[in-house]
From Swiss-Prot:
Location in or out of the cell: Secreted
Family membership: Belongs to the peptidase S1 family. Snake venom subfamily.
Species of origin: Gloydius halys
Keywords: Disulfide bond, Glycoprotein, Hemostasis impairing toxin, Hydrolase, Protease, Secreted, Serine protease, Signal, Toxin, Zymogen
Tissues/organs with expression: Expressed by the venom gland.
Listed name of the protein: Snake venom serine protease pallabin
Role, per record: Snake venom serine protease that may act in the hemostasis system of the prey.
Propeptide regions on this chain: 19-24
Keyword Mitochondrion: no
Span of the signal peptide: 1-18
Active site (UniProt): H65 (charge relay system), D110 (charge relay system), S206 (charge relay system)
GO BP terms, alphabetized: proteolysis
Gene this protein is translated from: JZTHR5
Length: 260
């Protein structure tokens, strides 16, 4: 079953496929406390359900399917149990989508911009991640991270984010395993993983970053369940293809069009 990687018990929407909302990284290791200053945690009702990426002092990039009511955003967080001194909390001031927030039938526009209710300041554990200056190349070694599940078969969630290196693959590698979904021949989606399996994002990791060449190149979107199966890589929204839309929204052009 394809999984939208968000915590199942938080899903109110009737989805035709499962996205990685609340996926944990599988096959990785605990992230170094200083390597994820841009990583944010999305909470609702005290439950961490998605990740996101701080792209400047006022804006967070995440997946559209991570949209829920009463979102709280934690920045500068490492351990869920032991707060950093410079942790900050925000709530959304505005949210922007390429699609209606309730429409997930187009697999390649799973993207949401959140404007924070007030800007954050850079600190020891908070700093934005650069948007891409060019698209990533197939074969690139990329890195993804999150507080999602760390077991493909058990509901095991970590206290601190886990990081894993995966490879950028041909899009067809994500399209071929799922003929029943009739995915388009071309897509604004990146395909990434390890073909032999064992390394992947998972439930709870949705919305988190795929980092290639030190830039925010992808947004964790969907993948198979169980996670980390051989020849079942995961899909990430391609940030570069949405760059004009992102920059227009941030500049105040809220009527900006999404890429076709």
């Amino acid at each position: 079953m394809v999984l939208i990687r968000v915590l199942a018990n938080l899903l109110i929407l009737q989805l035709s496929y499962a996205q990685k909302s609340s996926k944990l990284v599988i096959g990785g290791d605990e992230c170094n406390i200083n390597e994820h200053r841009f990583l944010v945690a999305l909470y609702t009702s005290r439950t961490l359900f998605c990740g996101g990426t701080l792209i400047n002092q006022e804006w967070v990039l995440t997946a559209a399917h991570c949209n829920m009511e009463d979102i709280q955003i934690k920045l500068g967080m490492h351990s869920k149990k032991v707060p950093n001194e410079d942790e900050q909390k925000r709530v959304p001031k505005e949210k922007f989508f390429c699609l209606s927030s309730k429409n997930y039938t187009l697999w390649d526009k799973d993207i949401m911009l959140i404007r924070l209710d007030s800007p954050v300041k850079n600190s020891a554990h908070i700093a934005p991640l650069s948007l891409p200056s060019s698209p990533p190349s197939v074969g690139s070694d990329c890195r993804t991270m999150g507080w999602g599940r760390i077991s493909s078969t058990k509901e095991t969630y970590p206290d601190v984010p886990h990081c894993v290196n995966i490879n950028l693959l041909e899009y067809e590698m994500c399209r071929a395993p799922y003929p029943e979904f009739e995915l388009p021949a071309t897509s604004r989606t990146l395909c990434a993983g390890i073909l032999e399996g064992g390394k992947d994002t998972c439930v709870g990791d949705s919305g988190g970053p795929l980092i290639c060449n030190g830039q925010s190149q992808g947004i964790a979107s969907w993948g198979d369940d169980p996670c980390a199966q051989p020849h079942r890589p995961a899909a990430y929204t391609k940030v570069f293809d949405h760059l004009d839309w992102i920059e227009n929204i941030i500049a105040g052009n809220t009527d900006a069009s999404c890429p076709p």
